[in-house]
Amino acid sequence: MPAIVLIGAQWGDEGKGKATDLLGGSVQWVVRYQGGNNAGHTVVLPNGENFALHLIPSGILTPGVTNVIGNGVVVDPGVLLTELAGLEERGIDTSGLILSADAHLLMPYHVAIDKVTERYLGSKKIGTTGRGIGPCYQDKVARIGIRVADVLDEESLRQKVHAALEFKNQVLVKIYNRKALDPDQVVDGVLEQAEGFKHRIADARLQLNQALERGETVLLEGSQGTLLDVDHGTYPFVTSSNPTAGGASVGSGIGPTRITTVLGILKAYTTRVGSGPFPTELFDEHGAYLAKTGGEVGVTTGRARRCGWFDAVIARYATRVNGITDYFLTKLDVLSSLQTVPICVGYEVDGKRTNEMPMTQSEIYRATPVYEELPGWWEDISGARQFEDLPAKAQDYVLRLEELAGAPMSCIGVGPGRDQTIVRRDILSRS
């Protein structure tokens, strides 16, 4: 079987965990291919149990699935161990989790530099989570990073950490007036943590390709979203990796020709956490309604999410840059009881209408949304399990989004639970 990529089509927080959980029973492998513990997935099981995952793939909650933290991920050892312990305390079997030997380790100095840099930037800060993700990726690209496999060779690990801190301590002390970190203490701490995950280190790319050759199905799970991609997002207000579909191949070691289905996750409205442009952002009672009804608080940061109407411009953009074949529309139920539901179908920039994503950030900031208003519905749709169960006006809304986004809305979420999903098309049958 080929591989399936699952990506966020907005600014993250679209409900990717729900989608992964739904598909988990039909796949044998779930792979996290980029990012770190700067994003969160929320999964609600049929029994009502709620799980918030930050680093471990959502497939960990499905028995029999092998979960992989791929080479494109940056791994905070402490967060990994804490998350594993939390799952095990709740009776979840974590024995099926493996860790790519080539994933990079997030070190204490990455967190320290991230925090002081944001503080130093003040009003010009990017709005990072302060968890060291960006500095860790910087080291990876600069070829001075620490890989997971380095914990298997203490002498080599010490040499690498000493070399890294020769420069980083200069930055911390002379630029930011902070205390220097002791390289041996850093190494000792990491080696102690490694005792809890060394047995999980594996040649993940080999195992994944062998699984595909055996006819098994691999689900590649991205974190964040398309508009946070370092290349294709609203730069510089982006993450430090590639959540887009192209990053799935690089971050897992699976060749692009193995991937035949790209499932985009779209919220029925739009949210964003942190700084950056957001053309449809609402500052009125409608924004407050979406935030309250949708429970729009970041899983990882605890920060309130900015809320706005659905933006078809960024949906079309996401379809294009990811090659999206299907969409999973989430939180449609949140829109119930609104008299009208506006959809942004284009922008006006400097007096000119455009239906495409502006080329520059300054243009995005100046973009005024052009809205098309659809009539709302008042019915409770949380019990709908077939598309025909939805009120006619809710159906019209979904079909209009499908037309504007340029790919079918194959699944529709009408509540947080795994079972609160309408499946219009079998995504796996396309693979």
From Swiss-Prot:
This is Adenylosuccinate synthetase. The gene is purA. Mg(2+) binds at D13, G40. Its main location: cytoplasm. GTP binds at residues 12-18, 40-42, 305, 331-333, 413-415. Binds 1 Mg(2+) ion per subunit. InterPro entries: Adenylosuccin_syn_GTP-bd, Adenylosuccin_syn_Lys_AS, Adenylosuccinate_synth_dom1, Adenylosuccinate_synth_dom2, Adenylosuccinate_synth_dom3, Adenylosuccinate_synthetase, P-loop_NTPase. The active site is at D13 (proton acceptor), H41 (proton donor). It is an enzyme of class 6 (ligase).
